[in-house]
Amino acid sequence: MSSKDIALKDIFEEIPHRLSKILAPVPIKELLPTNFPSTELRVDFLARLEDESVLHIEFQSFNDPNMPFRMLRYYLAILERYPSSPIKQLLVYVGNRKLRMKSRLRLRNLSFSYEMIDIRQIDCRVLLESPDPMDRLLACLCKVEDEVYLIEKLI
């Protein structure tokens, strides 16, 4: 940040009365804190795909009403790091209750969405046939039609 930007921030921490009338569409009620605490963002899974796009996967175990905001924060962080790569986002719901989260955010000046899937929609047989033990373990969370088959494959 340049010294000019810092000086302007200091000046406008308390915006002059007349300028506020010009810039603000409605009179200012109160001044709010200008700093935002920074938190380290960490996604569950991030990879570059063969087509040069970036795939982001989040696993979520409960219905979080703030999930669209979290996914937007992740999207912006990924976009900042990989600005020339298309970004594909997927939320995989692994909770016990019915999936009720929204996968989009619609505000006056912003529209944002991502893909979402309930892991129970995935046929467990695909994962059970994998040589990777983690795939087989995750199969327990997927759609299970034959529990005996599932148990045999896990043992």
What are these regions (language model features)?
Residues 1-155:
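Elongated, amphipathic alpha-helical interaction scaffolds
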